[in-house]
Curated annotation (Swiss-Prot):
Leader peptide range in chain numbering: none
Effect of deleting the gene: Pale green leaves phenotype and delayed flowering. Decreased number of chloroplasts and heterogeneity in size in mature mesophyll cells. Abnormalities in chloroplast and thylakoid morphology, including disorganized grana stacks and alterations in the relative proportions of grana and stroma thylakoids. Lesion mimic phenotype with activation of defense response markers in the ecotype Landsberg erecta.
InterPro entries according to UniProt: Aldolase_TIM, GTP-bd, P-loop_NTPase, ThiamineP_synth_sf, TRAFAC_Dynamin-like_GTPase
Stated name of the protein: Probable transmembrane GTPase FZO-like, chloroplastic
């Protein structure tokens, strides 16, 4: 199955092809392109950028990737199909049918969509917007010629004609319009001849080429396949047979350009079948090339001891576990492919990567090591892609072939003996101005087992070389420095000064005492080997007389050092095994540090989410306390109404219950229950109690509205706070039921019911009854005393006795009158008692209304907060578990590193 382009949201198949083993067609071709932004922060790692700053200087901004430039190259699955449309085709005719065809093509086969600008700028922009919304993250969208429109719609890049802008200008313009992207924009070049194609691929740094459909274009493609290492898409002529298409793909064409007409005729389906067929055939052929007899001694691990074999197997197991944990902790971390690749290469040949500035002589050094001029040399950048050199024992010249493989590597199979156990990789210069080539080198460095840094004697340790050395420190790589072109020095003293300069500064940069440096003249060594190439059967090391030329002798010393890596019985050979095993260990340690930083940040974010949720709940509780404080004013107003009514009633009682109110007393005494309500009691009902009750009902109604509006407003604010704080967390868990919303509306209005149960008429009647009783007792007492006195004087015989009887009866009347104020005060006390009881009852009712409202508010917010808190807590628990797993795997890696460091110690020595 072919790997998907990297910007799709797919993390289920992260195991990319080994960067050092010969890759298979159909895998991912790394290109400099823009892709739609991802979800979270997992692909932007918390890693310090040390490429352009001093080692002790802290970057002010967070580096966006593991690589010093801060940019990455996306991946494109090839062979594939490129759909080329015209804006008029999209906007005119049956638009829905066109978009439907494109949609189905994107789902089945198309990886790149190019829209031509034959229409007006406005129509092109509108068509680009339509396609952008349709393409989404399924493919790359390129705009022909119009960099401004590509920038405006956020396209993946542009396709430029020969007369268009330079590729580097277009790329820089697109990068400037989207500074937040970590991926380089994609720039394609539509070419017509070999010369323009060569310029576009080498000098301009185009990402891929598009050819026409004519016979001449096919011939151009045949010529380009021999010299161009970037993908080439050929336009379908419509009359090729499947066999011809398959042959084109086998020859190295990366895919076909199709049109809307091809979609309507289902031609894309047939082409897709051809692409799949080419993948199967090329995959089979490449596997056959890899299954060479010399391949049986993988990684040069010959005659390993049981202890060493055990460590190798243990490392594979621990690193696979590390990969699983990294996938679990950071599913979108693409850099884990570095570790996956390194683990897959443990059993592969030792990987020696040649790095350095362009024109430092990297290709010449490699040619000298191989004993033949296999690689192109020049004063301008000649290596535009990663060039992978593998061993082949087939001596036939036609079998010494190089292939462009879909993972971005140019793989050459050569019969050089040194390649049997060491794979050599040539890389673009560290100082090339084309960012795509620089990213190639930066991304390949972590995979290296040994870095051979080629310095040019005329400019040793330039600024770009120093920056590159700082970048490589994070991968803990071993360096071998080659001071090439050393023959430019006039004498040994100048050479020694240069060697001292390089060693002293590299010691400081790499913080190491052991700096391995060989001053050589690769060109002289190569010429010496070529001049004696007729000496068949002799080893390359014996070709030149060591004493004949110090330049050749110095190169021979370099070769001896490299060949010593092949013998595991020597100290250098043991170091090779250690370096081979430490390559994935260094990558694992670097990735673990990044993942641990991410997990720590996520833990902090989860804790902050919990704290934020608790803060919203606490804020609600504080608001409830604030409402309780503000409710005091409402209670005072309500109690004031009761108190005012009480005072008026008491004052009325004091005015009414007087002995001078003879007419009122006679009315109460002689008419009794049959008498109508007097003016005083009518005043109590109509002018005091009725208005007071009306005002109280109005006040308590407003109080209930105040409670409801405040709780509803605060509940709504809390709900919005949760939704605004976590806008993406909206699912069934956060959907509130009707009962929950009813909490904010629910109120029993106990205080209002308390007042509604009171009746002004009933209360005034009770008061009138009490007043009637006072008058009846008082006036009745006076009347009884007078009647008794009359009867006694009529029956008593003497005057003295009459006077005594009158005195006694008068005393009884006096007692009745004397008790009148007491009875009046008793009524006032009764009124006060009733008023106090009512006030307490009303205050309790208002407090209950407040308690119910605030309790419902807090309950509502707790219900709203529950799913958010649970989600944050689950996330925190999961992250804490991941932290524990990361800590455990780091401990395992540390123990494994100790075993690797002790590889050179035998079991007997370990026992001692």
């Amino acid at each position: 199955m072919r790997t998907l382009i990297s910007h799709r949201q797919c993390v289920t198949s992260p195991f990319l092809i080994s960067a050092a083993s010969p890759p298979f067609p159909g895998r991912c071709f790394k290109l400099s392109s823009f892709t739609p932004p991802r979800h979270r922060r997992f692909s932007s790692l918390s890693i310090r950028n040390i490429s352009h700053e001093s080692a002790d200087q802290t970057s002010s901004s967070r580096p966006r990737t593991l690589y010093p430039g801060g940019y990455k190259r996306p991946e494109l699955a090839v062979p594939g199909l490129l759909l080329r449309l015209d804006a008029d085709e999209v906007m005119s005719g049956n638009r829905e049918e066109t978009l439907d065809l494109v949609d189905r093509a994107l789902a089945k086969s198309v990886q790149i969509v190019v829209i031509d600008g034959g229409a007006t700028a406005g129509k092109l922009y509108e068509a680009a917007c339509l396609l952008k919304s349709l393409v989404k993250g399924r493919a790359y969208l390129l705009i022909a010629e119009r960099v401004d429109i590509a920038s405006a719609v956020g396209a993946s890049g542009v396709a430029l004609s020969d007369e268009g802008l330079p590729a580097i200008v277009a790329r820089n313009t697109l990068m400037g319009s989207n500074p937040d992207s970590v991926l380089l924009p994609l720039v394609a070049r539509i070419v017509k001849d070999v010369d323009s194609a060569l310029i576009a691929s080498s000098s301009e740094g185009a990402d891929f080429l598009i050819l026409g459909s004519g016979e001449e274009d096919t011939q151009v493609a045949d010529s380009l396949l021999k010299s161009v290492k970037i993908p080439i898409y050929v336009t379908c002529r419509g009359n090729e047979e499947a066999k011809e298409e398959l042959q084109l793909l086998k020859s190295g064409v990366s895919g076909f350009v199709i049109s809307l007409k091809d979609l309507r005729s289902s031609r894309d389906v047939a082409l897709r079948q051809s692409l799949d067929g080419a993948y199967v055939v090329n995959n089979h052929e490449t596997q056959n090339m890899n299954e060479l007899p010399e391949k049986k001694n993988s990684a040069g691990f010959i005659k390993l001891e049981d202890k060493q074999k055990l460590i190798v197997e243990m490392e594979k197991s621990v690193l696979r576990e590390t990969i699983e944990i990294i996938h679990k902790a950071a599913p979108l971390m693409e850099e884990v492919s570095l570790l996956i690749d390194a683990v897959s290469r443990i059993d592969e040949p030792f990987l020696m990567v040649i790095v350095g500035e362009f024109n430092s002589g990297k290709s010449t050094v490699i040619n000298a090591l191989l004993g033949k001029r296999y690689l192109k040399e020049g004063v301008v950048p000649t290596t535009n892609e990663i060039t992978f050199l593998c061993y082949s024992d087939l001596e036939s010249e036609e079998q010494q072939r190089c292939q462009t493989h879909p993972d971005g590597q140019y793989v050459c199979y050569l019969p050089a003996p040194i390649l049997k156990d060491i794979n050599i990789v040539d890389t673009p210069g560290t100082n090339v101005i084309l960012q795509r080539q620089q990213r190639l080198t930066e991304e390949f460095v972590p995979r290296a087992d040994l870095l051979v840094f080629v310095l040019s004697a005329d400019r040793p340790l330039t600024e770009s070389e120093v920056a590159f050395l700082r970048y490589t420190q994070q991968w803990k790589k071993k360096f071998v420095f080659i001071l090439n072109k050393s023959d430019i020095y006039r004498d040994a003293r100048e050479l020694e000064e240069a060697i001292s300069f390089v060693k002293e500064n590299t010691r400081k940069l790499l913080n190491t005492e052991n700096v391995i440096l060989y001053p050589v003249s690769a060109r002289s060594a190569l010429e010496a080997k070529l001049s004696t190439a007729s000496l068949v059967g002799r080893d390359d090391l014996e070709i030149a007389d060591p004493g004949s030329n110090w330049r050749v002798q110095s190169f021979n010393e370099l070769e001896k050092f490299l060949y010593s890596f092949l013998d595991s019985s020597t100290a250098t050979g043991m170091e090779r095994i250690r370096l081979k095993l430490e390559t994935p260990m260094a990558i694992a340690e670097r990735l673990l540090s990044s993942v641990e930083a991410l997990v720590r940040q996520d833990c902090l974010a989860a804790r902050e989410d919990l704290a934020s949720a608790d803060k919203i709940i606490s804020r609600t509780k504080e608001y409830a306390l604030k409402m309780e404080y503000e409710s005091i004013s409402w209670r005072r107003q309500a109690l004031s109404l009761i108190d005012n009514a009480r005072l008026q009633v008491v004052d009325l009682i004091g005015t009414t219950l007087r002995l001078s109110s003879l007419d009122l007393a006679i009315s109460y005494v002689f008419k009794g229950e049959k008498s109508a309500s007097v003016a005083a009691t009518s005043k109590v009902q109509g002018e005091i109690l009725a208005p007071a009750l009306t005002n109280a009902k109005e006040l308590l109604g407003k109080y209930a509205e105040w409670l409801q509006s405040n709780t509803a407003r605060e509940g709504s604010l809390s709900l919005k706070s949760f939704e605004n704080k976590w806008p993406t967390y909206v699912n069934s868990k956060t959907q509130l039921g009707i009962d929950t919303y009813d909490l904010l509306q629910k109120t029993d209005k106990v205080s209002l019911k308390t007042i509604q149960n009171l009746s002004a008429g009933t209360t005034s009647k009770r008061l009138e009854q009490d007043i009637r009783e006072v008058f009846f007792v008082t006036v009745g007492g006076l009347g009884a005393a007078g009647l008794s006195a009359s009867l006694l004087t009529s029956v008593l015989p003497t005057t003295l006795e009459d006077l005594l009887a009158l005195g006694l009866c008068s005393a009884g009347g006096y007692v009745a009158i004397a008790n009148f104020p007491y009875r009046r005060q008793a009524i006032i006390g009764k009124v006060n008692k009733v008023a106090d009881a009512l006030a307490q009852q009303l205050e309790d009712a208002m407090q209950k209304d407040l308690s119910d409202a605030t309790s419902n508010l807090v309950n509502f917010v707790n219900i709203v907060a529950k799913p958010y808190r649970e989600e944050a807590q689950l996330r925190l628990d999961r992250l804490l578990g991941i932290q524990k797993e990361l800590s455990d795997i780091r401990s395992k890696l540390q123990l494994l590193q100790v075993d690797i460091d002790n590889l050179h110690v035998s079991r007997d020595e370990m026992r001692l």
